[in-house]
Curated annotation (Swiss-Prot):
Sequence ranges assigned to domain FAD-binding FR-type in this UniProt record: 2-102
Pfam families the record matches: DHODB_Fe-S_bind, FAD_binding_6, NAD_binding_1
Keyword Transferase: no
Similarity comment: family membership: Belongs to the PyrK family.
Record flagged with keyword Electron transport: yes
Taxonomic lineage from the root: Bacteria, Bacillati, Bacillota, Bacilli, Bacillales
This protein's UniProt keywords: 2Fe-2S, Electron transport, FAD, Flavoprotein, Iron, Iron-sulfur, Metal-binding, Pyrimidine biosynthesis, Transport
Quaternary structure, from the entry: Heterotetramer of 2 PyrK and 2 PyrD type B subunits.
Cofactor, how bound (note): Binds 1 [2Fe-2S] cluster per subunit. Binds 1 FAD per subunit.
Binding positions ([2Fe-2S] cluster): 221, 226, 229, 244
InterPro entries for the chain: Cbr1-like_FAD-bd_dom, Cyt_c3_hydrogenase_gsu, Dihydroorotate_DH_ele_sf, Dihydroorotate_DH_Fe-S-bd, Dihydroorotate_DHASE_ETsu, FAD-bd_FR_type, FNR_nucleotide-bd, OxRdtase_FAD/NAD-bd
Record's function text: Responsible for channeling the electrons from the oxidation of dihydroorotate from the FMN redox center in the PyrD type B subunit to the ultimate electron acceptor NAD(+).
Residue positions binding FAD: 53-56, 70-72, 77-78
Name this protein carries in UniProt: Dihydroorotate dehydrogenase B (NAD(+)), electron transfer subunit
Length: 257
């Protein structure tokens, strides 16, 4: 159920270049279940900036009543969010969207998780939940450079993990698709989140496989009312789907990337 709450900042720390890990406490956590969903955060009490920021859920801890989100400081909104200290509160709406289908990976199957940059965070909760279901998880994480790398050890706790950097400063030099090819990584189902070129490359590389992609789009309302995040459906000039409410996770081929 979607709710709204002024959640309390439990902790915040810089974990990579311009990348922050923010942990929030509140009753709204009990509504958070599906990996790949997101929350819409109002970063300031004033009307500037006006729009909420869509931030994916990285970790859900029902026992502690806490959720963790990871974001990159890009503009005024996230700069304000980066200033939040423990004890401060933020206005949170969520959980929103349709996340990754866990049922696509039955017990004893092999799931390949592929993340690019700030698309990595939602895959962490996915890795955790898949592992609990008896799924073998292999992760491939892509970043621009070593300074941008985060959560490598955290993913390694769930299984085989590979890192690629564009400049070769850490892990494999190149892209996530280079790692998949070089390592001949096999899978029964693939889950991915990251920039569109990466998602497009994965969809084209595995056209007849179960591939689920989480799209990153700018959003206005987060609930499907404003039509700011629509994407087209293949074979139609008029049909579309909304990333915020129909997604953000789609099966490859379901929408035009």
């Amino acid at each position: 159920m979607i709710g709204r709450e002024r959640m309390t900042v439990a902790s915040q720390r810089l974990i990579a270049e311009r990348t922050y890990e923010l942990t929030l406490s509140g009753r709204l956590v009990q509504e958070m279940r599906q990996p790949g969903q997101f929350v819409h955060v109002k970063v300031a009490a004033s009307a500037d900036p006006l729009l909420r920021r869509p931030l994916s859920l990285c970790h859900i801890d029902h026992k502690q009543g806490q959720c963790t989100i990871i974001y990159r400081q890009e503009g005024k909104g996230t700069a304000l969010l980066a200033q939040k200290q423990p004890g401060d509160t933020v206005d949170v709406l969520g959980p929103l969207g349709n996340g990754f289908p866990l049922e696509a990976a039955p017990a004893d199957s092999r799931a390949l998780l592929v993340g690019g940059g700030i698309g990595v965070p939602p895959l962490y909760e996915l890795a955790k939940q898949l592992t609990k279901r008896g799924v073998k998880v292999v992760s491939v994480l892509g970043f621009q450079t070593k300074a941008a790398v985060f959560y490598e050890e955290e993913f390694a706790a769930f299984g085989e993990t590979h890192v690629a950097t564009d400049d070769g400063s850490h892990g494999t030099a190149g892209r996530v698709t280079d790692v998949i090819e070089a390592r001949s990584l096999e899978f029964d189902v693939l889950y991915a989140c990251g920039p569109k070129p990466m998602l497009r490359a994965l969809a084209e590389r595995f056209p007849n496989r179960p591939v689920y992609l989480s799209l990153e789009e700018r959003m206005g309302c987060g609930v499907g009312a404003c039509f700011a995040c629509v994407c087209h459906v293949p074979g139609s000039e008029t049909a579309y789907k909304k990333v915020c409410s129909d997604g953000p996770v789609f099966r490859a081929g379901e929408v035009v990337l």
